[in-house]
Amino acid sequence: MKNFYTDSTFLSFELQNEYKEFSFSSMDKKDNNFSFEMTSFENAFLFGLLKKYKPTKILEVGLAAGATTRMLVDHVFKQENCSLFSCDLNNNYYRDESKRTAYLALDKYTPDQKKWHLLTGKYLPQYLNYIGGDIDFCILDTVHSLPGELLDFIAVLPFLREGTVVVLHDVNMPLIWQDLPRRNAHSNEVILDSTVGEKIICKDPNNFGGISNISAVVINKDTYKYINNVFSTLSFSWSYLPNQEEIEVYANHYLKFYDADTEEYLRNIYFLQKEMLERVNNTKNTKKSKENFINKIKNLLKKSVL
């Protein structure tokens, strides 16, 4: 394991504490009790990477309330030559539709289309031509369930330069959260394990066994050479089915940067995943109908006894 992973020694406890303070001091007092979707350790990991690699073009995919976005914008505005592109499919915050996506960042900053570009309401491939290439730092933190971030990673790879750091959040969500409904939230773990490149993983002292919920991979020439390893994982069982429009957007995008076989592979996998998920849903509905029928009979028997 030690030979496979990079020991993130730049992530000292001092650095973790520094960014713990930064993460809260950068928020207004009214937001201090907000439940951040990254812990102080995970923020330290992220900003430790920024400090070490000094990127000039950052892509953030998945914004939620915008706590991490706000810290990233704060970082970018302090750098002389650095820009941030923040993307999310949702125009409004998924937990509270009355608020805009990234509202915590918007409370303090206004997108200026120079240092900070806020892009919401479309799928990632629909923004990539606008964003352009030479991205040297990328954060993937969206739905966490397959196909989720896997589709986005394949889409964005042609726009990443060699040496780009790709940060993957919630790589061990089912283990860390012990949340049964999210037990299949493996999309970023799948990306981490199937992508060829230098892996950056650090032990989190706050979790049992030091298991970390955030990791990174550094892109190199072999990442592109062995991208079929990543494509192959599209055959893993999906937790949800994207709509037809979404699949068309991604399939057409892949066709521009990969061979026709990969685009056809996505379409074939989509068809098979659709068949499987429909069978799963039908089984669930049948089981529920049986349970309802049994409960109805039980209630009738109780009434007849009374």
What are the roles of these predicted feature ranges?
Residues 1-44:
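Mobile, glycine- and charge-enriched loop segments
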Residues 32, 43, 47-301:
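S-adenosylmethionine/decaboxylated-SAM
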